[in-house]
């Protein structure tokens, strides 16, 4: 992923280019056959077969528009390079994360709030996009498509054989871990050698123990991570008591393999790990439950984020044609084509199947008890995953205090310009 400092340079070039050229672009051009060309660039190369099928069906049913969907490797790098060259596609399909925030802040996206399909999206996912705005903006700039969910994967057969129940509170969770341990089975496998895996349980705990807009509140100067992340850090460290010895010696693949072989009853990771696990044990019966981070079940929140969403570029010359493409993409049958190929949770309200592995999460999904991954707000150059691993390796008495202080200081260091921008906006609003 490109560093934020690099992107700031990209944004500066973009701002200059837009002023000088009026958003010149290559999208929405007329083809030799008279059709309007609409180009979509997706950041998900793993979904290329689904998009090829969708593209083919669209083109077979539309006489006036030709749709091209590309899903290149390193799509984000390619997009940023194209933006510098003012070679804009009409629509981009990316995740709801810091890249979306940066592109939106660079004023690249058009307001699509007049698109009827906006009204069909689950409110929780629209709210996630609003919280990704550095500065509040009127309008809607992305249409969430498919979401994922992360909590704790568990071996359903092991649970059934031993009479173990899915926990709904932190006390029930630790009691269950003790019970599993006493049976001779390892409760958890972590695989923290690959630092990014540290973020999986961190995010799942954080959404239940902190407000979803914590990062924005820190930017506004209303709180600090030292004041808010203490319970998250405490419970993150508590997981070590129930995991493999020296989890920093084993990586993601090791953890998937160990869990697949029944070496641990649970694995705190997202549903995205299931294909890797099933490559080792295709017949494994896997479930996934919301991380029970709180003392009361009613306080728990499912960690769910937007895996894919569509934004219309401001440079798009034919918004009507772009809207026709979006309407087709958000047809129930089209969404199902994507879900059948890639899985996930439909962001659109409707009668879409929830994957069997996520069935325990259904009440949270259906009742919008969901919040976005906190790391979607973290600047990549801050390397929060490595910070968490370092904290967990630190056995000193003041390890947590040092970790949280560093989180605060590094946040200010890597978000200095953003914090100034947010607080200037707050002052302007106060003076208005």
Model-derived regions, located:
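Hinge/lid segment of periplasmic solute-binding proteins
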Residues: 95-150, 174, 180, 201-203, ...
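Glycine-centered hinge/linker elements that transmit conformational signals in sensory
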Residues: 177-180, 218-248
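Conserved C-terminal helix/tail region of periplasmic/extracytoplasmic solute-binding proteins
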Residues: 160, 336, 369-432
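Mature extracytoplasmic/periplasmic domains
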Residues: 108-111, 261, 272-276, 308-382
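Extracytoplasmic "Venus flytrap"/periplasmic binding protein-like
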Residues: 57, 61-125, 157, 161-162, ...
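A structural signal for short loop-to-beta-strand junctions that line the ligand-binding cleft
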Residues: 81-82, 89-90, 119-157, 186-190, ...
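Extracytoplasmic/periplasmic solute-binding protein
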Residues: 137-145, 150, 174-221, 264
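Extracytoplasmic/periplasmic substrate-recognition and gating elements
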Residues: 60-61, 66, 138, 162, ...
């Amino acid at each position: 992923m490109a560093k934020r400092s690099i992107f700031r340079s990209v944004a500066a070039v973009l701002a200059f280019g837009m002023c000088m050229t009026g958003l010149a672009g290559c999208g929405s051009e007329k083809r030799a056959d008279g059709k309007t060309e609409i180009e979509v660039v997706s950041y998900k190369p793993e979904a290329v077969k689904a998009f090829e099928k969708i593209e083919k069906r669209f083109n077979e049913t539309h006489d006036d528009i030709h749709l091209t969907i590309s899903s290149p490797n390193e799509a984000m790098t390619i997009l940023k390079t194209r933006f510098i060259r003012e070679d804009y596609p009409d629509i981009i399909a990316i995740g709801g994360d810091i890249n979306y925030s940066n592109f939106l802040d660079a004023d690249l996206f058009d307001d699509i709030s007049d698109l009827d399909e906006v009204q069909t999206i689950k409110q929780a996912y629209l709210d996630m996009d609003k919280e990704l705005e550095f500065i509040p903006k009127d309008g809607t700039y992305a249409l969430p498509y498919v979401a994922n969910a992360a909590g704790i994967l568990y071996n359903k057969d092991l649970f059934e054989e031993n009479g173990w129940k899915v926990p709904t509170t932190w006390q029930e969770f630790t009691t269950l871990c003790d019970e599993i341990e006493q049976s001779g089975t390892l409760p958890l496998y972590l695989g923290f050698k690959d630092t990014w895996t540290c973020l999986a349980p961190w995010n799942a705990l954080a959404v239940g123990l902190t407000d979803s807009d914590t990062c924005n509140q820190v930017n506004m100067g209303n709180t600090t991570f030292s004041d808010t992340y203490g319970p998250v850090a405490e419970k993150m460290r508590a997981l070590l008591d129930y995991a493999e010895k020296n989890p920093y010696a084993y990586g993601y693949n090791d953890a998937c393999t160990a869990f697949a072989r029944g070496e641990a009853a649970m694995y705190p990771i997202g549903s995205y790990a299931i294909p890797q696990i099933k490559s080792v044990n295709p017949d494994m019966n896997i479930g996934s439950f919301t991380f029970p981070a709180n003392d009361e079940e009613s306080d728990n929140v499912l960690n769910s984020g937007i895996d894919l969403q569509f934004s219309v570029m401001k440079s798009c010359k034919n918004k009507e044609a772009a809207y026709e493409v979006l309407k087709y993409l958000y047809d129930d049958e089209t969404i199902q084509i994507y879900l059948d190929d890639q899985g996930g949770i439909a962001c659109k309200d409707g009668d879409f199947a929830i994957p069997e592995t996520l069935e325990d999460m259904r009440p949270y999904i259906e009742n919008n008890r969901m919040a976005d991954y906190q790391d979607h707000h973290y600047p990549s150059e801050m390397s929060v995953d490595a910070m968490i691993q370092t904290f967990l390796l630190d056995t000193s008495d003041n390890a947590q205090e040092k970790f949280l202080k560093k989180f605060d200081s590094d946040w200010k260091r890597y978000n200095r310009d953003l914090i100034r921008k947010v607080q200037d906006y707050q002052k302007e609003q106060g003076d208005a």
